[in-house]
Amino acid sequence: MVMTVRVIAPDKTVWDAPAEEVILPSTTGQLGILSNHAPLLTALETGVMRVRQEREWVAIALMGGFAEVENNEVTVLVNAAERGDTIDLETAKREFSEAQAAVAKAAQSGSKQAQIQAAQAFRRARARLQAAGGVVEI
């Protein structure tokens, strides 16, 4: 049994296809969705959503949002999203390294605003790198 999965950002539909399984980065941890899942509405963290079609997994970097599950339909509304197969791995690695350095610099600055912004940029860079297939070492 399959379900319909849609990932919608303000500027585009990132994914609209059937799938057998979905793993979402919810605010309470990873959340697995299979066919006939109970109705659900959940907030999503910045992270990687994984969609399984037959034996293939597709990774999608999500930048926060919400997911609704109902009647074998999973609708994900996000601020921004990118399929992992469209992200350049080398660029993602470089951005992740830069984000790590920015977190360290912000911690030394003592500015709460700088720390929050650096942490958000770090989460985005980590999600993009993971979706692109990179190994994240912290």
Curated annotation (Swiss-Prot):
Membrane-topology annotation of the record: Peripheral membrane protein
Keyword field: ATP synthesis, CF(1), Hydrogen ion transport, Ion transport, Membrane, Thylakoid, Transport
Matches recorded under CDD domains: F1-ATPase_delta
Record's GO cellular component terms: plasma membrane-derived thylakoid membrane; proton-transporting ATP synthase complex
Listed InterPro entries: ATP_synth_F1_dsu/esu, ATP_synth_F1_dsu/esu_N, ATP_synth_F1_esu_C, ATPsynth_dsu/esu_N
Record's subunit section: F-type ATPases have 2 components, CF(1) - the catalytic core - and CF(0) - the membrane proton channel. CF(1) has five subunits: alpha(3), beta(3), gamma(1), delta(1), epsilon(1). CF(0) has three main subunits: a, b and c.
GO molecular function, one term: proton-transporting ATP synthase activity, rotational mechanism
Protein name (record): ATP synthase epsilon chain
Gene: atpC
Origin superkingdom: Bacteria
Function: Produces ATP from ADP in the presence of a proton gradient across the membrane.
